[in-house]
Amino acid sequence: MSDRLAVLSQYLLPKQALTAVMGRLAQARAGDLTTAVIRRFIARYGVDMSEAADSDPAAYASFNEFFTRALKPGVRPLASADWVCPVDGAISQIGAIEGEQIFQAKGHSYSATALVGGDAQLARQFDNGHFATIYLSPRDYHRIHMPCAGRLRRMIYVPGELFSVNPVTARGVPGLFARNERVVCVFDTDHGPMVLVLVGATIVGSMGTVWHGIVNPPRPGRIQDWRYDDQSIVLGQGEEMGRFQLGSTVVMLFPASAGLRFNGQWTHAAPVRLGQKMAGRNEA
């Protein structure tokens, strides 16, 4: 299918209904049928179960349990770096934020204000800073970890579309990551503020965080804003902060004052792993 037809199909699909149905099916505990579906998925996408804490497909009571599986201890060691990669995936885009514009794909960008749900004051903290967008494919590990230590200040649920977030739609749907449903997490770190955005997509049944649990569903159709200034929720570098139940994309924002320099091996479409060096301060 051509890119144009693939993108057109995304506009025509009943994405909300499809996602709701698939979310319910992914939670179903259907015994041997669930195991058969998991085995088929592993074969179809080449999932490396040797890295899973439990490598037996029959050990997972539901597809969601399999999809959010834990890794064996030690298979993703943390690099000695100011920022480490928070997920397994592939780089969609990385680079400088131009004013408040974030590059999505050739001919497409979107504003930091739109990404965080319309809060211009929050977005301004990242003017001329840096961003990283990482796509998680179906075969990847789908828990999200902290790129650096941070204290949680705020979480914003932003309702939106449920377009697929694969490379084809990233090239073809304007403002994709600022249009899709998303969960915006705001942290204070030793390097200044940091935003970590979990972006939903077609068939992504839900997104959750370690401090809140499942954020969606429900899908109330309005922005929800949680503040944590009166709580001491501190997560260390490499510590789990959230997960996707069926995969998607993570977008990170860093302020100009952080002096961030990306790993020179990080380029468009390059595969990345949790714990690898993502960036250092004023380093090549």
Swiss-Prot record:
<feature type="active site" description="Charge relay system; for autoendoproteolytic cleavage activity">
    <location>
        <position position="88"/>
    </location>
</feature>
<feature type="active site" description="Schiff-base intermediate with substrate; via pyruvic acid; for decarboxylase activity">
    <location>
        <position position="248"/>
    </location>
</feature>
<keyword id="KW-0472">Membrane</keyword>
<keyword id="KW-0444">Lipid biosynthesis</keyword>
<dbReference type="GO" id="GO:0004609">
    <property type="term" value="F:phosphatidylserine decarboxylase activity"/>
</dbReference>
<dbReference type="InterPro" id="IPR033178">
    <property type="entry name" value="PSD_type1_pro"/>
</dbReference>
<keyword id="KW-1003">Cell membrane</keyword>
<comment type="subunit">
    <text>Heterodimer of a large membrane-associated beta subunit and a small pyruvoyl-containing alpha subunit.</text>
</comment>
<feature type="site" description="Cleavage (non-hydrolytic); by autocatalysis">
    <location>
        <begin position="247"/>
        <end position="248"/>
    </location>
</feature>
<feature type="active site" description="Charge relay system; for autoendoproteolytic cleavage activity">
    <location>
        <position position="248"/>
    </location>
</feature>
<keyword id="KW-0594">Phospholipid biosynthesis</keyword>
<dbReference type="Pfam" id="PF02666">
    <property type="entry name" value="PS_Dcarbxylase"/>
</dbReference>
<feature type="modified residue" description="Pyruvic acid (Ser); by autocatalysis">
    <location>
        <position position="248"/>
    </location>
</feature>
<comment type="similarity">
    <text>Belongs to the phosphatidylserine decarboxylase family. PSD-B subfamily. Prokaryotic type I sub-subfamily.</text>
</comment>
<comment type="pathway">
    <text>Phospholipid metabolism; phosphatidylethanolamine biosynthesis; phosphatidylethanolamine from CDP-diacylglycerol: step 2/2.</text>
</comment>
<keyword id="KW-0210">Decarboxylase</keyword>
<keyword id="KW-0670">Pyruvate</keyword>
<keyword id="KW-0865">Zymogen</keyword>
<comment type="function">
    <text>Catalyzes the formation of phosphatidylethanolamine (PtdEtn) from phosphatidylserine (PtdSer).</text>
</comment>
<keyword id="KW-0443">Lipid metabolism</keyword>
<keyword id="KW-1208">Phospholipid metabolism</keyword>
<dbReference type="InterPro" id="IPR033177">
    <property type="entry name" value="PSD-B"/>
</dbReference>
<protein>
    <recommendedName>
        <fullName>Phosphatidylserine decarboxylase proenzyme</fullName>
        <ecNumber>4.1.1.65</ecNumber>
    </recommendedName>
</protein>
<dbReference type="InterPro" id="IPR003817">
    <property type="entry name" value="PS_Dcarbxylase"/>
</dbReference>
<dbReference type="GO" id="GO:0005886">
    <property type="term" value="C:plasma membrane"/>
</dbReference>
<dbReference type="GO" id="GO:0006646">
    <property type="term" value="P:phosphatidylethanolamine biosynthetic process"/>
</dbReference>
<feature type="active site" description="Charge relay system; for autoendoproteolytic cleavage activity">
    <location>
        <position position="145"/>
    </location>
</feature>
<keyword id="KW-0456">Lyase</keyword>
